[in-house]
Regions:
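Post-transcriptional modification and biogenesis factors for structured RNAs
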Residues: 1-171
Length: 171
């Protein structure tokens, strides 16, 4: 419900609500501003990919971004480059955590799990609406372009460990 309330109205294509959701008075304000279709609870449950759906589904138009949308003036950009992430929940959590850390965007390699997987979307907890993102056919090219524009690149891997607080990061 929270994610639905955060999406920009002009990006909403269709809205479907369960009968029980439509009957709850607490949802009147949420539904007042959109056209929606009421669906029998039994059918709604089949439409949803979760075991206990909240009663509202929306088809939302994707927003297209470029790397330029992520490059901030004054060398303030912090782009999260993700390569080959396979778990949808992990991808969504990384995007959500990145937003909390102040990233200006996310660039993913094309072998990363689908950003629009329902589990990924849910685990972003709305960050997908606020953080510019793109999937790149030229992942290395994006990293090089970011460096060319003054960005600093830090990498992680599973074979070593270091406390992120020990890094000297630019202000």
């Amino acid at each position: 419900i929270r994610m639905f309330s955060e999406v920009e109205a002009e990006r909403i294509v269709s809205v479907f609500v369960s009968e029980s959701f439509a009957l709850e008075n607490a949802n009147e304000n949420l539904l007042a501003k959109v056209h929606y279709e009421v669906v029998e609870d039994k059918i709604f449950n089949k439409m949803s990919d979760t075991q206990t759906p909240q009663g509202i589904l929306a088809i939302v138009q994707k927003k297209e971004y470029s790397i330029e949308d992520m490059i901030l003036p004054g060398n303030q950009s912090c782009i999260l480059f993700l390569e080959g992430i396979q778990d949808p929940g992990n991808l969504g959590t990384m995007i959500r955590t990145g937003e909390g850390a102040g990233i200006s965007g996310v660039i993913m390699s094309k072998d990363t799990v689908d950003l629009f997987n329902p589990k990924t979307i849910r685990s972003t907890m709305g960050s997908i609406y606020r953080v510019p993102h793109l999937v790149s056919d030229d992942f290395l090219g994006c990293i090089l372009e970011f460096q060319k524009k003054g960005g600093r690149v830090y990498a992680t891997h599973l074979l070593e460990n270091m406390n992120i607080k020990s890094l000297i990061m630019p202000k």
